[in-house]
Amino acid sequence: MIAMKNILIYFDYPITSIQGGTEQASFLLARLLVRQGFRIIFLSLHPFKEKNNEFPQYSLPDSEYLFSRRNADFTEKLCDEQNINFILNEGAASDSSFFFSHAHLNTKATIVSIINFSIWEGLDHFLSLIPPSGNTWPAKLKTAARVVSAPWKKYMAIRKKKAKLNHLLEYSDKVVVLSQKYIQDCLFLTSTRNAHKLYAIPNLLTFQIPESLSPGTKQNILLYVGRLSYADKRVDRLLSVWKKLQPVHTDWSLYIVGDGEYRENLEKISEEYHLKRIFFMGHQNPEPFYKKSKIVCLTSTHEGMPMVVNEALAYGCIPVVFDSFHAAKEMIPDTETGRLVPAFNLKQYTKTLDGLMKERYRRPNFKVLDKYKEEIITRKWLHVLKNGNE
């Protein structure tokens, strides 16, 4: 057990236990570290609407512009007054990495930058990031122009990514990524001079694995859980697949659990495709849906290490995922665990689902979840936090 040390955990949005994604992962990490004797405080750019009684919460005074002098002064004073030993920046994939750096902040605290996404963030599938402009001729010409300019834009985006990663590694004390694969990606895009600063730690399991799971509780449900956005999640692909499957599998349904800026577009696509037995459930606790679903679907352009895959396995759902991010094979190593489909091959994705829907349901192998257990994640984090920035 480490002697009491103080940790500030930052994310742009307030860290809570009821949100998904990075917010939930950060909250679970905070609880883990408290159990190891650390004291935790939260800091966010945007003000919190509801206080939690578990951790002290602070928000930056200037929510409109992170890089204001007021925010820097506030952060430095907070670190000094609270005797902060470590700053954990959970938003290091964003531009906050330039703020929480020794180039910007005057602090003795050890800065640990945490990248909760893939390193490439879809740049290796650049054309898939370009949304179509529409079906009219002017819109099609606009889309064509975007495609023509894509190689140059990709080159510039990768150049910017390299510069950002180099800055991150230079001015952070330590950098945590989700997978050993992402350490390799970092070193491919940057020099190896700061390789010693890189650590691979996946997120904790968000649910306890049920000891027993009756197949009788499972229904003929395909499930999507997550944010409804275009560039990364591409749920429109799943709707295209469902369009082909629904006439064949009339006793199956598709549930979409989540919300986001692309929801309205998806609902319009659903109407255009005349989709049946599709339910947009909005933002809800996904646990009841995992319990009754047989298959969880991901058709993303890029992911980090999506918690939805581990959550699905914990509740006996078979994950069917595009092999579009470099940690995919680590999460789904074999067909006993789930199904990996070649990236963006909708025909193969449809065929894979069709086969599973025709087969008798069998609970997938969840042995892979052992690597996300608390004792393993704890050991990895204690190694990162052991010696500060020594």
Where are these regions (language model features)?
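Short His-centered aromatic/hydrophobic patch
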Residues: 89-95, 115
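Aromatic "clamp/platform" in nucleotide-sugar-dependent glycosyltransferases that forms part
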Residues: 301
